[in-house]
A protein has these predicted regions:
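Short helix-loop-beta junction
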Residues: 1-10
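Detector for C-terminal structural segments
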Residues: 1-2, 22-145
């Protein structure tokens, strides 16, 4: 909040339970459960370009179909998405996705905020912890004394 204020962006937080937030994420900004919010900050894992970009920028992913929470739409983006989805060769698909990414950065429909919530401290009773190199931690290696 303080960092954004330095950029002349004044925000107020409406802190809600995480699952409620996720439910609204699918319902969209027009739903009463959004409480009049003009933005949302939802944690998610982006595992591939389609999961990371397409569901937030395609007019075909408006709620309740998917997670285009703010109903962002741009015909150019839809064209790049269609090109990527129908390209079965790596180079044309990657080129369309790279252009989509560049346009997302240029148009800036989002502010990308990351807060690493990965565990970094454990009780001494927990053994076999392998610190993650990404957002996910493998609990299969762990045990308790």
């Amino acid at each position: 909040q303080q960092s954004l204020k330095q950029c002349h962006i004044d925000i107020q937080f409406d802190v809600i339970e995480w699952n409620t937030l996720f439910t609204n994420w699918r319902k969209g900004s027009k739903d009463p459960s959004a409480n009049g919010a003009q933005a949302t900050n939802v944690s998610f894992a982006a595992m591939d370009p389609f999961f990371a970009m397409v569901r937030f920028t395609s007019t075909k992913t408006f709620p309740p179909v998917s997670n285009n929470w703010g109903y962002f739409g741009n015909p150019e983006f839809d064209g790049l998405i269609a090109s990527a989805r129908t390209s079965f060769e790596d180079k044309p698909r990657d080129a369309a996705l790279a252009k989509l990414h560049a346009r997302i950065v240029e148009e800036a429909p989002f502010i990308w905020i990351a807060h690493d919530v990965g565990p970094r401290a454990m009780s001494q009773k927990v053994k076999g912890v392998v610190q993650p190199r990404s957002w996910f931690i493998d609990i299969a290696t762990m045990s308790m004394d």
